[in-house]
Amino acid sequence: MKFFLNTGRTIWQGEAMEAGKNLDLYVKAAGVVYINEEDMEKLGVKEGDKVKVKSEYGEVVVYVKKATERMPEGMIYIPMGPWANCVVKPDTHSTGMPTFKGYPGFYVEVEKTDEEFLDMRSLMRKKYIEAVE
């Protein structure tokens, strides 16, 4: 299914980032996608399932979390971090920060998957070390 991707900070992602990006707390806060209940039903997923999010820039496997705040149908939210970085526009405009927002029509494909979820270390190895070997 096609969804509009929104990204940004969350309280939990920020707190976990300060505690340490290699901790399970950070993985649980940033390696997720928030989806509203109606869209979860359409995708045939429940909280804790894995989905693959694909864009023209890349793809990533994340865990599903039910959106607890109002989110329109057709929109998903991935907290800012390495998992979101896999699918957002990589141009940093010399800031060192990817373009998480500010470009119209950013749609991604989302599908349920049994593929492996990559923790922080494995994700970095795949994206930045193995990619150049």
Swiss-Prot record:
GO terms for molecular function: molybdopterin cofactor binding; oxidoreductase activity. Gene3D superfamilies: 2.40.40.20. Pfam families: Molydop_binding (PF01568). This is Protein FwdD. It comes from Methanocaldococcus jannaschii (strain ATCC 43067 / DSM 2661 / JAL-1 / JCM 10045 / NBRC 100440). The gene is fwdD.
